[in-house]
Amino acid sequence: QKMRKWRIEDSEELYNITGWGTSYFGINDKGHVVVTPRKNGVGVDLKELVDELQLRDVAAPMLIRFPDILDNRIEKTSSCFRQAAEEYGYKAQNFIIYPIKVNQMRPVVEEIISHGKKFNLGLEAGSKPELHAVIAINSDSDSLIICNGYKDESYIELALLAQKMGKRIFLVVEKMNELKLIAKMAKQLNVMPNIGIRIKLASSGSGKWEDSGGDASKFGLSSSELLEALDFLAVSYTHLRAHETGAYLV
């Protein structure tokens, strides 16, 4: 039996390009991968681009970035949340936070910070080394810095010292011992900490991340621990207010 000629549609199905490429990647009539960073914008033939780079003596492997895709995803995230907020009557201020563990390369993070400024975009660090990187790269004093992950004294100290330097830093508490350590370090450094609390919801959702909720989830404070934390903060705040004014709980 004679085999039929391979078609563009066969390549699209084989590589599932419509599944992961969203509206950015596709296959043109030459059978080449084409990228369209902006909706209704000009497409770039990646095969022709690589050929042109090789003519300029640029050898493989090559790392090709498309900042417009980053910009467009930031805009899309902000737009979707804004629409949902309008639909459900959500009135509070909100911020987009980018975890730098996703991609720590400086050009990527700088592009995200630059374009995200008008969308209240901040950065998240999950460790002391990541916090060092965030502090160094994020010069916007109005941008939020969220500290997650395991917190020892040195990590907390760095966050509090950065706060004293004018950074808007929030330490997110996942365990009671972290809260007590933050209060201890804040008193030593004479600073009123900005504290966030991760809550372990009793009800779990559905889908891929359903195990991250519910009483059996690994992260966050239970309802009883939350009450304990609030009582602890009420007592600690009376001690800290002698040094600073103002407190934040998110």
Can you name each region flagged by the protein language model?
Residues 1-195, 216, 223, 227-231:
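A charged N-terminal "starter" segment
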Residues 199:
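Flexible glycine-/small-residue-rich
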Residues 205-225:
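Flexible glycine-rich active-site/ligand-binding loops centered on an Asp-His dyad
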Residues 235:
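Acidic-enriched catalytic cores of C-N bond-cleaving enzymes acting on peptides and small amides
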Residues 238-245:
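Conserved small/polar residues in nucleotide/adenosyl-binding loops
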